[in-house]
Amino acid sequence: MKFLAFGLIYFHFCILNRCEYITSSTIQKCYNSSNEPNNCSQKAVIVLSLENGQIANTEQVVATLNQLSDSGVNKQLQNSFIFEVTKSPVTALFPLIYLQDFNSQPLEQVIATTLFSCKDGFYDSSPTCKFQYDSKGQKILDSQGYCCYCSLSDILGMGNDLSRGKVCYALNLGAGSATAHCLKFSPLWYSAFKIQQYQLYFEVNINIYTVDSQNQKNLKQTLKLSTSNPTMKSSDNSTISKIIGTFTPTQPPADLSSYYLVKPSFPATDPRVLQGISSWMFVDKTMFTLDGTQCNKIGVSYSGFRQQSSSCSQPVGSCLQNQLENLYQSDLILLSQNKQPKYLLESQGNFNQVQFQGQTILQQGLSGSASTLITIEIDAAQIKFVTNLGIGCISQCSINNFESHSGNGKLVALVQNQGNYSAEFVLGFNCSSNVQPIQGQKLFLTANQLYNFNCSVSVNSDISAINNNCTINLYDAIGNQLDSKNILFNTTSTNHTSNQGNNTGQQQSSQEYKSSQSCSDKCSSFWSFWCYFSAGCIKEAFKSIASIAGVASALALVIFLAKNGYLVPIIRFLCCCCCKSKKKENEKNKDKTDKKSIQESCSYDRSCCSHSISQSYQVENKNKYKRSKIQRSFSSESCQDKSKKIINELSNLEETFEANKLYANIDKNSSIFEYFGFKKSFTFILYERNDILFLPQNSTILDMIGALQPQKGSYLAQKFLEIVNKNALKVVSTSPLYLLIE
């Protein structure tokens, strides 16, 4: 067996005309098969790490076989081989499975009608909203919508509840007393797709050249590797190439397992359909109703719209929120404010649609490092590895001012390859401590290419900060720094919000979703007995009819009593009974309070009532004849006579004004005489303790009497003051009023 000796293997790192050589080793490998037993040959195995996004001539492998040893004699080969290896950008492929179509914006149509003409039954020949039919010509269940009627309380002018889409007027049974609510669909429809688990995909192209004695390079053949075909062999069996594996990307693909992909699909002439992928969206699966039975979700159907809970007491459109059109328009607003959208594809990364092996695929480009190991086994004696070192600069760079934790920070940098060769560059970032680290990026630029690089920027602090800084460094493939720029930017404090009230938001009421509807849910008004009948709620229907009959009977009775003159006397009788009962209770409470006040406030010495004697007399009421014993205690006959005279005059004064209540009693323990008189607002209490007559402060005529201004008072006050003056009563105090008998 011949022994083939290798020469040295060189790796060339070239910058224009300057080259650096690094030695490498070789390995020996034998292949043994049943067809060619013991067929051993010496191979050179080249292991390469290819980065993501490398382009033609960025990384080139040149292998030259120049000599071998035969029986100890070295022989120079006339021809050599050259291998050029390139790798396409790494992408993530997401297979799509069609789910179903969804309307962009379901709409509610409101038709004004009357109580007797609105029809929404499934067996009605011509319901107000009309029926919709499927492709087989069959009526679609619940496509007839539903009717809402003004309730009895609305017709009587007493209703104050929200009525869906209608304005109910008192005594109106004509147009506007009922409305029909119909579900209509907008012209634009979206197609939804399930998103499958991603697969990484890239291609590696290996060009094999031969170089003759005239140093002419001739293409011999091309090997094309991919994730679908990881191993290839040249036609002359001189070269074998394999993909060993790919490292996990430093920026992995987006996790789309919880989303549906939706894209405008028809009509084909719709402007949004013609926009292509820029109008596609990722929407969370929880925002959809696949059976159409849930309100305020994408895909709500006729049944979901018609069977919504308490439909007639909800605002118009209450079941048709959070639709695809709403999501799209909200993202347009965010984009107009230079903010990140929530649903459009760019919210998750850089995506495209491709056809792969006859299947519709969603493709995401990966911007981070995703190194791939490949091997090339060749019959060679010397290998040169060439890497172009570029010359580049950062022409522009900036970071916008943004709110902390808002996700709206963005770094933009323009990087240019100023060399004449395609080359690899590395961007490194060094930022202040409160800025979250930014991942370094590898760039592969063609000659004189200007590349616009951007990435998001975040800070770790909630508070505002001035002059945050980030330094951007540009390196070549072996770490030589080519350029450096420093960026200053400001951040504002985080704007905290809440949906639970106080200073940060408005409290929102919770919503309960019920799996089944009760009779009260199906019919918004208790008085709508026809609604209960149509819903099969017979018991509730009879309750409603009985209540209506009761109200009608009560109204008829009131009208009858009023017409025959009985209503006013009955009302007066009831009011009188109520007022008397309440007045009696108030006077009892007032007696107790005033007694206690007098006992605590009066401290005058007894002047004429030192000896106790008993006397009783009768007080007669004009309307009701009652007799009460009045026990008085006086120390002298003159004091007794004078006090009795004053009491009699006051009694006569009350009789003059037709008081409807008069009584007197005596508290034996405190010797307080209580006199009650004057009906309604003129009621007052007159006390006598020893030689002092007291009028409580809460008397309605106290201000007039206490100020002793009869010219401003009523006739009653003037008469009272005449009694005071005639009997030479001395005013001791006006608030409260104390009258001293002299």
UniProtKB/Swiss-Prot annotation:
It is a single-pass type I membrane protein. GO terms for biological process: fertilization; plasma membrane fusion; single fertilization. Keywords: Cell junction, Cell membrane, Disulfide bond, Fertilization, Lipid-binding, Membrane, Signal, Transmembrane, Transmembrane helix. Residues 20-540 are extracellular. It holds the Pfam family HAP2-GCS1. Disulfide bonds join 30-40, 118-147, 129-182, 148-312, 150-168, 295-319, 431-470. GO terms for cellular component: cell-cell junction; plasma membrane. Residues 152-179 are annotated as: Important for membrane fusion. Residues 562-742 are cytoplasmic. One of its GO terms (molecular function) is lipid binding. The chain crosses the membrane at residues 541-561. Residues 1-19 form the signal peptide. InterPro entries: HAP2/GCS1, HAP2/GCS1_dom. It is found in: Cell membrane; Cell junction. HAP2/GCS1 family members mediate membrane fusion between gametes in a broad range of eukaryotes, ranging from algae and higher plants to protozoans and cnidaria, suggesting they are derived from an ancestral gamete fusogen. They function similar to viral fusogens, by inserting part of their extracellular domain into the lipid bilayer of an adjoining cell. The region that is important for membrane fusion binds to lipids and can insert itself into lipid membranes. It is unstructured in an aqueous environment and assumes a more ordered, beta-stranded conformation in the presence of lipid membranes. Belongs to the HAP2/GCS1 family. During fertilization, required for the formation of intercellular membrane pores and subsequent exchange of gametic pronuclei between cells. Probably initiates the formation of intercellular membrane pores by inserting part of its extracellular domain into the cell membrane of the adjoining cell in the mating pair. Mating requires the presence of HAP2 on at least one of the two cells. Mating efficiency is high when HAP2 is present on both cells, and is strongly reduced when HAP2 is present on only one of the two cells. This is Hapless 2.
